[in-house]
């Protein structure tokens, strides 16, 4: 039976021309395992990222949502275990918003675990588990999805490293082929 998978990625941000999450998600096949993929690029803007994804969720009614974002400095693809109710970053989003330690939802839980088996998926795919999606727009998106939808839909977040062409010297990066392979393995084993 074919299932619906919504896979999101982000536009470039912080005055960069490339976002590795966008490049990798665009390279994914349209059908992987039991899943028909719908790909969606979202803005790197607090709140608007969720608004964009929320509209697509309501239209598509996916079985699973996988959000993919870029995390410079990481050497491997990482599955995020928890989203935190916190906005704080040293850089602005793509509309110039910058927060220094505020809650996403004043009445929300401090943290919400994703409802995917991240340890199992990491082991199968050769990825790592991370306990922090940060406090920028990536975390904002997965927190808002989990807070709004609770367990009505499975949702998780995956951070991918920079691509080699985004780095200088021996900075952490991973090839596009390796990132796409790991994302594919994760999807095949959802």
Kindly label every feature range from the protein language model:
Residues 167, 179-180:
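Mixed-charge interfacial surface used for oligomerization/domain docking
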Residues 1-135, 146-151, 171-177, 187-190:
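N-terminal catalytic or cofactor-binding beta/alpha core of small enzyme domains
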Residues 123, 145, 153-166, 184-188:
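C-terminal folded domains that constitute the principal catalytic or ligand-binding module
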């Amino acid at each position: 039976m074919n299932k619906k998978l919504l896979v999101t990625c982000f536009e470039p941000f912080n005055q960069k021309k490339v976002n590795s999450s966008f490049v990798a998600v665009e390279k994914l096949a349209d059908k992987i395992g039991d899943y028909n993929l719908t790909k969606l690029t979202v803005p790197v803007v607090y709140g608007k990222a969720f608004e964009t994804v929320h509209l697509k969720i309501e239209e598509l009614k996916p079985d699973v949502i996988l959000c993919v974002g870029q995390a410079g400095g990481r050497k491997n693809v990482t599955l995020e275990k928890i989203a935190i109710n916190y906005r704080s970053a040293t850089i602005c989003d793509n509309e110039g918003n910058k927060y220094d330690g505020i809650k996403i939802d004043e009445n929300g839980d401090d943290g919400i675990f994703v409802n995917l088996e991240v340890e199992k998926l990491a082991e199968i795919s050769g990825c790592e588990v991370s306990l922090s999606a940060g406090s920028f727009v990536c975390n904002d998106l997965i927190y808002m999805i989990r807070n709004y939808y609770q367990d009505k839909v499975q949702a998780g977040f995956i951070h991918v490293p920079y691509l080699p062409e985004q780095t200088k010297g021996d900075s952490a990066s991973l090839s596009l082929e390796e990132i796409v392979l790991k994302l594919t393995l994760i999807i095949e084993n959802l």
